[in-house]
A protein has these predicted regions:
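Single conserved hydrophobic/aromatic residue that forms the stacking wall/gate
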Residues: 174-185
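N-terminal capping segment at the start of a domain
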Residues: 8-24, 173
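Flexible, compositionally biased loop and terminal segments
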Residues: 1, 6-9, 33
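Short internal beta-strands
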Residues: 63, 167-173
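Cofactor-binding active-site loop characterized by glycine-rich and histidine/acidic residues
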Residues: 15-18, 30-162
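Short acidic/polar active-site loop segments enriched in Thr and Asp
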Residues: 25, 166
């Protein structure tokens, strides 16, 4: 087992424990993110610093599918943004680890997300801003396959192409065929 596989499996374990302790959540959407998050955060792809979450030179990661927040919390805790013990406070009253990520509460969360289809637009705007400022950072967005049916996602993709945003990386999780793909009629 490679180090990245070990980290992804550790995240999956944390995700299952968090959701079981909370008694609610989105296990499938969260578990499906582990490999990508391990590669980004621990594979030398995403330039970040848990000691300085607001470091100006950091790359940005936007979890467009905000309902998969347990996966983001698991990778952030593993990376050292906050103590892993805090993971078991998911969805409890008064905790900062809610069902959708909140950038005002959780270090390492770039954008509060939850409404499907908006993450890529935010990421494209951030990438455009960095590019206009002449900064070399990259913006990564993780989208679910279901939200790609939102028109806003395609508008953001067209904007990114038109603006030549080569500092924007969209990762798409294709987890299963839609019922329409399975139709026999």
């Amino acid at each position: 087992m490679t180090e990245l596989e070990r980290r992804a499996n550790e995240m999956r374990s944390d995700i299952v424990r968090m959701i079981a302790e909370a008694g609610s959540g989105h296990p499938g959407g969260s578990l499906s993110c582990a490999d990508i998050l391990a590669a980004l955060y621990f594979g030398g792809v995403l330039d970040h610093d848990p000691e300085r979450p607001d470091w100006d030179e950091r790359d940005r990661f936007i979890l467009a599918k905000g309902h998969a927040a347990p996966a983001l919390y698991a990778v952030l805790a593993q990376a050292g943004y906050f103590p892993r013990e805090e993971l078991l406070t998911l969805r409890k009253l008064g905790t900062r680890l809610q069902g959708h990520p909140d950038s005002n509460l959780v270090p390492g969360v770039e954008v509060s997300t939850g409404s499907l289809g908006q993450g890529l637009s935010v990421a494209a705007g951030a990438a455009a801003g960095l590019k206009l400022d002449g900064k070399p950072q990259t913006v990564f967005a993780l989208l679910g396959d279901g939200e790609c049916q939102e028109g806003q996602v395609w508008e953001a993709a067209m904007f990114a192409a038109h603006r030549n945003l080569d500092n924007l990386v969209a990762c798409l999780l294709y987890t299963s065929p839609s019922p329409r793909d399975l139709s026999t009629s």
